């Protein structure tokens, strides 16, 4: 058994893992389509259980604290190293929580990274060729390894995300974590820390919650198998707040393997939400989700969510084209908060409207702690416009935050999304054929309707000299 588990924790966790193994389903789209990858390929096969911890108050806000279990599977053709610290030949495992509310997904919590230390050789994802007996420091081909929620929430094995390069999986096995900020309760630190108000059923009627785990591993990355490493599972929130454990969370439905949480947004409204992945050469993957909501009052809400799956270069700007004549209001931005002493800023990106674009911009990379769109996070960009979206997808642009390198030279990523349409010009009285010009063709239409209602412009139900005067006044 894993030495970090007590016997009681192992028995309870084993029951949860057993149940969770039958709550996993493979879904194509970012995965391997059911075929084995060449080389080692680690995925999240199941999110089997959840642990909750004592809530607390930080900077005047009440928070709950959670951890999610994760069962890894090696679906590749080679073994995966699972060496404990100080070696860096093991996976790191971030955990996240999202909320889908009023048709929009937002990230509301994130943990530090659990560091793997050994791997059981189980069979969640199929036939297993064990790498050894017990809990060896290698995960065999086809084998699975369960980490319970209590294990993933153990602060002794949680370390900051910052020193990890998610696109290569490389980090120092001896890196030092930042000091805890003053006043942050110990029970909250390093775990999935969530505002009570973001979970309160009275304030979140109809909301859906989404848990997510991912595995980052340098062997997986070097084998080009790193784009299927996140999986999600839906969560429900109980009605009663506990002063010792916060709100109860219950995992529901299957674990959706090899798809990050942004796909839960699409699954919640498949006819309205689009999601597409974009790979940065020499770096990692971003996913853009978009939705346009008709407000029923002559305005439309444009919602964009970008999830950084495993890009080290991060996102630093986002631009959406807006045609001339469109009235834009309610420009907004949302990002999850860093609160564990990482030093990262939580400042909102600056929004500007100029040169036919709405652009949100992060501080430049001269500030190493700027609020860039870092890996395993999801940021939101939104506005309201007085025109519907154009029929075809338009081009939006995400700028990369870190400078180009010799192997990753791009400075931005073009993406497809729904964008505002060109406003319909107002109808000019006398322009019968709607071509935007009052000309001879329109005059002929009016004259052909003389004495009848066909050429009427002033609403008196007959075509006469008054209508002709209106047409001639708008000539050209």
What residues fall within each predicted segment?
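Sec-dependent, cleavable N-terminal signal peptides
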Residues: 1-32
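Short beta-strand elements of extracellular/lumenal beta-sandwich folds
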Residues: 292-312
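Solvent-exposed N-terminal domain segments of exported/luminal and surface proteins
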Residues: 30-31, 35-238
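Alpha-helical segments with a strong preference for the paired helices of cellulosomal dockerin domains
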Residues: 432-454, 460-476
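Beta-strand-rich extracellular modules
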Residues: 214-216, 384, 401, 474
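Solvent-exposed beta-hairpin/edge-strand motifs
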Residues: 317-346
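Short beta-strand elements
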Residues: 32, 219-274, 410-423
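Low-complexity, intrinsically disordered segments enriched in Ser/Thr together with acidic residues
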Residues: 183-203, 361-394, 400-405
């Amino acid at each position: 058994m894993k030495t970090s588990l007590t016997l009681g924790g192992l028995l309870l966790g084993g029951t949860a893992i057993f149940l969770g193994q039958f709550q996993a389903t493979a879904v194509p789209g970012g995965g391997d389509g059911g075929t084995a990858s060449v080389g080692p390929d680690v995925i999240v096969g199941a999110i089997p259980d959840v642990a909750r911890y004592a809530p607390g108050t930080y900077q005047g806000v009440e928070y709950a604290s959670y951890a999610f279990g994760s069962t890894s599977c090696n679906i590749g053709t080679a073994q995966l190293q699972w060496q404990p610290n100080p070696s860096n030949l093991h996976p790191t495992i971030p955990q996240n929580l999202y909320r889908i509310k009023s048709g929009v997904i937002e990230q509301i919590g994130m943990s530090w990274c659990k560091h793997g230390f050994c791997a059981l050789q189980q069979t969640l994802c199929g036939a297993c060729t064990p790498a050894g007996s017990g809990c060896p420091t290698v995960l065999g081909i086809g084998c699975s390894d369960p980490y319970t929620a209590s294990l993933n929430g153990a602060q002794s094995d949680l370390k900051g995300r910052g020193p990890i390069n998610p696109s290569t999986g490389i980090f120092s096995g001896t890196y030092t974590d930042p000091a805890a900020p003053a006043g942050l309760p110990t029970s909250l630190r390093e775990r999935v820390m969530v505002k009570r108000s973001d979970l309160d059923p009275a304030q979140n009627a109809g909301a859906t919650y989404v848990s997510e785990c991912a595995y980052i591993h340098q062997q997986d990355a070097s084998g080009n198998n790193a784009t299927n490493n996140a999986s999600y599972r839906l969560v429900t929130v109980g009605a009663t707040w506990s002063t010792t454990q916060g709100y109860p969370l219950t995992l529901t439905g299957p674990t959706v393997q090899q798809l990050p949480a942004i796909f839960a947004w699409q699954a919640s409204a498949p006819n309205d939400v689009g999601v597409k992945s974009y790979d940065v050469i020499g770096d990692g993957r971003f996913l853009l989700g978009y939705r346009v909501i008709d407000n029923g009052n002559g305005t439309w809400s444009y919602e964009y969510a970008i999830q950084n799956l495993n890009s080290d270069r991060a996102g630093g700007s986002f631009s959406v084209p807006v045609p001339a004549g469109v009235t834009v209001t309610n420009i907004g931005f949302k990002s999850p908060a860093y609160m564990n002493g990482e030093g990262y800023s939580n400042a909102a990106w600056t929004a500007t409207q100029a040169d036919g674009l709405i652009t949100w911009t992060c501080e430049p990379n001269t500030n190493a702690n700027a609020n860039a769109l870092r890996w395993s996070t999801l940021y939101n960009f939104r506005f309201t416009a007085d025109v519907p979206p154009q029929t075809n997808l338009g081009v939006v642009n995400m700028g990369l935050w870190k400078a180009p390198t010799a192997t990753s030279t791009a400075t931005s990523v073009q993406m497809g999304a729904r964008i505002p349409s060109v406003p319909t010009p107002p109808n000019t009285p006398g322009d019968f054929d709607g071509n935007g010009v009052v000309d001879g063709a329109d005059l002929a239409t009016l004259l052909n309707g003389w004495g009848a209602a066909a050429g009427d412009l002033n609403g008196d139900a007959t075509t006469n000299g008054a209508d002709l005067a209106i047409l001639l006044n708008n000539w050209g």
